[in-house]
């Protein structure tokens, strides 16, 4: 009985699996790259100002994320995954600029990358929540929201994972790999953007 109470049937909804699931880890993946990975990569250039620079990147990323959350809801479309598509599209240049910043060890480019990744983070977070609200019924909303956040939190492991892989691959290469993975996620969402809509919206 207890386990039955913990079940979230809406988590098996095809729209959740093919639209929300591919984008969710990128929420805090983008944020983590902006305020954890980039400061570390710029360490040799920022020197004694490293802590201040890290704080600046965090402020820029989270500030841009907060800003886009206020306006991002306007891009929502009940008949498609338009807002999520926009959010994942923002992720591509963000990671691309991060790769260039890492290659050139340029704090200025890192600042730009943090801003773009911050925008992507905020847009991803709000667009995913809106999609979850449509998929879940009233009884499943709290549970599905918890599942959604649990998946987004996987992004917090990105900095640690990149630090481990950096023994074999450079950060520019890993950021480019991130662009490829984000593009694949975007491709999946594009394929299912107008499919498996919640029954109340399908007509």
Question: Residue ranges of each PLM-predicted region?
Answer:
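Juxtamembrane intracellular "pre-TM" segments in multi-pass secondary transporters
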Residues: 1-20
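Pair of pore-lining "gating" transmembrane helices in MFS-fold secondary transporters
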Residues: 14-34, 111-116
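Transmembrane alpha-helical cores of Major Facilitator Superfamily
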Residues: 25, 56-59, 63, 115, ...
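Short amphipathic helix-loop junctions that connect adjacent transmembrane helices
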Residues: 36-52
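Transmembrane alpha-helices of Major Facilitator/SLC transporters
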Residues: 54-77, 90-94
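C-terminal transmembrane helical hairpin of 12-TM major facilitator-type secondary transporters
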Residues: 81-126
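A late C-terminal transmembrane helix in Major Facilitator Superfamily
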Residues: 121, 127-174, 178-179
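Multi-pass alpha-helical transporter architecture, strongest
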Residues: 179-203
